[in-house]
């Protein structure tokens, strides 16, 4: 049975349990699917693997979906949008870029975007970055969490853009990653959402070695950190 299209309106019961939507396809024609829980006014958008060679966030977000389904009190007064695999082309090919060789996290319509061979022909030239932009426009999230991994030799950290300092520090209370303001990358989702739209956005930079962990180990290591983002400013239970 296919997932419903993005434009279809699910029932309240289905939204409570997590409604899947196909929101479009990648440049390589792979469906991109989000899961939406609830329909409350406090909105959190969590995405992973916009860089396909940073895969650890995908099983972490999928485990988050399982946790929400078994703890439906998290949905009270909230909408939670999960995008476990933002760059399926790169994920399959184990590369940073999509199938067209574009770094999706340099393809957003941010005021600091620069033209380069790997940033796309123009802002939002890629279907994946357009899809993420459309999700933001439709749901107007109160906060965005984008899961990444640092490169070999670089320590993991919690980066942020826009008015997200307090959120980043709250998340840091539940894991061993420090808050480290890395600076707004040109054309990144952080720059677009945090600086242009003034939406608090955290770039959660996990460690390179986290790719070697099982899904359960990832959840034990970082699950409560994601829950802290969802329940912010209330502490997670």
Language-model features, listed with the residues they occupy:
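Short beta-strand-to-loop junctions in surface cap/lid or active-site-entrance loops
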Residues: 33-42
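Active-site/substrate-binding loop(s) of hydrolase catalytic cores
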Residues: 41-47, 54-182, 208, 213-214
